[in-house]
């Protein structure tokens, strides 16, 4: 199957998925959490699979995953919610990465090769490798879901990408899940406000540590965002 046919096939699959989501009202479940909780409790393993599937589809369609992480915290609680969201987020980012690889670099460069995000990511990987991946996962320089596709077009290997994505996603997932679960169960209390402040402080410290790591490794994130990419490297 050539690149153009792959692209048309992928568009057809996306269209069918969107139609099925609309027809079965799957995303409506996210705005009706009591119904979603009941459905999952009655469905057992299928309910967990449904949540993971929704997460993957949302990520492929570039919808914000934080909404689903919050829903997971409310529906599943802090521990199971964190585990399921981590599994779902890891599978989702891997699917986006592999889809970009499958569609092919030459085809996708026609559509995204000129974008500042892709140019910055490819130049950063070429210069700094894994360090750049770690930093862009921790520091919100680019939209997270777009990164998944962009990294699929670079020379980075699949398994390091997947492992690092999972590890760097975990802190945010834990915070969102725990806070959502506590808010759903107890409402806005003094304890919740204190936890919210501590969570914000923890994320701020994490970002600052990532910036210190960037300086230690001599990773110039600002320069990589400004510079255009004129000679992309081929897969090797």
Swiss-Prot record:
Protein name: TVP38/TMEM64 family membrane protein YdjX
UniProt similarity note: Belongs to the TVP38/TMEM64 family.
Transmembrane helix keyword on record: yes
InterPro entries: VTT_dom, VTT_domain
GO cellular component: plasma membrane
Species of provenance: Escherichia coli (strain K12)
Record Pfam families: VTT_dom (PF09335)
Domain of life: Bacteria
Keywords annotated in UniProt: Cell membrane, Membrane, Transmembrane, Transmembrane helix
Location of region: VTT domain: 73-183
Record localization: Cell membrane
Domain description: The VTT domain was previously called the SNARE-assoc domain. As there is no evidence that this domain associates with SNARE proteins, it was renamed as VMP1, TMEM41, and TVP38 (VTT) domain.
Main location: membrane
Annotated membrane topology: Multi-pass membrane protein
Listed transmembrane segments: 7-27, 50-70, 72-92, 156-176, 192-212
């Amino acid at each position: 199957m050539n690149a153009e046919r792959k692209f048309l096939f992928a568009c057809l699959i996306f269209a069918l998925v969107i139609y099925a989501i609309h027809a079965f009202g799957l995303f409506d479940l996210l705005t009706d959490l009591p119904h979603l909780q009941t459905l999952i409790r009655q469905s057992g393993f299928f309910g967990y699979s449904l949540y993971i599937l929704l997460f993957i589809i949302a990520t492929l369609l570039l919808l914000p995953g934080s909404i689903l992480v919050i829903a997971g915290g409310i529906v599943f609680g802090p521990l199971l919610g964190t585990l399921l969201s981590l599994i779902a987020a890891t599978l989702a980012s891997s699917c986006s990465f592999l889809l970009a690889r499958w569609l092919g670099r030459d085809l996708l460069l026609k559509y995204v090769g000129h974008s500042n995000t892709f140019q910055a990511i490819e130049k950063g990987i070429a210069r700094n490798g894994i360090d750049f991946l770690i930093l862009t996962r921790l520091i919100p320089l680019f939209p997270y879901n777009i990164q998944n596709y962009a990294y699929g077009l670079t020379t980075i290997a699949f398994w390091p990408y997947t492992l690092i994505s999972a590890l760097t996603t975990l802190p945010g997932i834990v915070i969102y899940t725990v806070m959502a679960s506590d808010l759903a169960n107890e409402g806005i209390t003094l304890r919740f406000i204190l936890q919210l402040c501590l969570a914000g402080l923890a994320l701020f410290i994490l970002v600052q540590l990532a910036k210190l790591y960037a300086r230690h490794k001599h990773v110039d994130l600002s320069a990589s965002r400004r510079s255009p990419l004129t000679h992309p490297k081929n897969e090797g």
